């Protein structure tokens, strides 16, 4: 699989591989990276669902300090081949016009500004994608270590003031926050990220400049 942008793929609801921000950054006019995965354990008899979440990433999303967008292209694209070998022989399922485009639960996703996620189960078919690339002549296998989860860290200290809670992990790191939203219905959680606290204990974000570094989670009507 590869993409002009970033992708995350899953089969039957299970994420494929451990890599984040796949396929990784490259100089898109010359090359695009791709990944291969062994997915036999994720397949089952009967119908299977392959789903790919596609984001703008470095290809056409916000990039560099000048807040530029669409540096390499106007919109993201994705390409994949699912190769199946069984008693019937070998056959390829290739990305193409028969792929449905679904309404995404992600209202936004970007490296600088974070994510907006709607947990209302939205998955309506809204059309067939036109941004599918099947030409892989310019794709190269990555030679660098993939970006993946290395360690899980616990909150060291939590301080609450009104409806704001400061979660201090005790050190700076590159990572994401995991929450349990199962107790929420029709509510919204906003998580801001920062490296420093102000003297009064509030979050200091001036050094982020225009980056929002914020996750917004909209819980649905049912607990999940």
Model-derived regions: residue spans:
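Extracellular/oxidizing-compartment recognition motifs
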Residues: 1-224
């Amino acid at each position: 699989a590869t993409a002009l942008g970033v992708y995350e793929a899953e089969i039957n609801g299970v994420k494929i591989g451990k890599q984040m921000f796949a396929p990784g950054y490259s100089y898109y006019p010359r090359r695009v990276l791709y990944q291969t995965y062994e997915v036999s354990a994720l397949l089952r008899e009967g119908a299977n669902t392959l789903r790919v979440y596609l984001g703008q990433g470095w290809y056409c999303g916000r990039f560099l300090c000048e807040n530029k967008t669409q540096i390499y292209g106007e919109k993201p694209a994705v390409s994949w081949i699912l190769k199946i070998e069984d008693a019937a022989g070998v056959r390829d399922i290739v990305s193409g016009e028969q792929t449905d485009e679904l309404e995404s639960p992600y209202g936004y996703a970007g490296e600088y500004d974070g994510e907006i996620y709607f947990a209302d189960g939205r998955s309506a078919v809204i059309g067939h994608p036109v941004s599918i690339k099947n030409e892989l002549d310019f794709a190269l296998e990555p030679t660098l270590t993939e970006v993946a989860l290395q360690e899980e860290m616990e909150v060291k200290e939590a301080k609450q003031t009104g409806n704001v809670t400061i979660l201090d992990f005790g050190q700076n790191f590159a990572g994401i926050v995991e929450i349990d939203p199962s107790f929420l219905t029709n509510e919204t959680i906003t998580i801001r990220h920062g490296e420093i606290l102000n003297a009064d204990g509030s979050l200091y974000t001036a050094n982020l400049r225009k980056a929002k570094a914020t996750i917004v989670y909209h819980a649905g009507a049912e607990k999940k």
